[in-house]
């Protein structure tokens, strides 16, 4: 875990990507559910 200098660990990329994707999907579905998604 300490040898991550000069290269981003793959688990960190996967975690950040997963959080971003889940966040975007959550915002999209919440917006469409509350009626704000129809105006996009």
UniProtKB/Swiss-Prot annotation:
Localization of this protein: Plastid, Chloroplast thylakoid membrane
Source superkingdom: Eukaryota
BP GO annotations: photosynthesis
Cellular-component GO terms for this entry: chloroplast thylakoid membrane; photosystem II reaction center
Segments crossing the lipid bilayer: 8-28
Topological type in the membrane: Single-pass membrane protein
Annotated keywords: Chloroplast, Membrane, Photosynthesis, Photosystem II, Plastid, Reaction center, Thylakoid, Transmembrane, Transmembrane helix
Subunit comment: PSII is composed of 1 copy each of membrane proteins PsbA, PsbB, PsbC, PsbD, PsbE, PsbF, PsbH, PsbI, PsbJ, PsbK, PsbL, PsbM, PsbT, PsbX, PsbY, PsbZ, Psb30/Ycf12, at least 3 peripheral proteins of the oxygen-evolving complex and a large number of cofactors. It forms dimeric complexes.
Task performed by this protein: One of the components of the core complex of photosystem II (PSII). PSII is a light-driven water:plastoquinone oxidoreductase that uses light energy to abstract electrons from H(2)O, generating O(2) and a proton gradient subsequently used for ATP formation. It consists of a core antenna complex that captures photons, and an electron transfer chain that converts photonic excitation into a charge separation.
PANTHER family according to UniProt: PHOTOSYSTEM II REACTION CENTER PROTEIN J
Entries under NCBIfam families matching the protein: PRK02565.1
Family: Belongs to the PsbJ family.
This protein's name: Photosystem II reaction center protein J
Organism field: Pinus koraiensis (Korean pine)
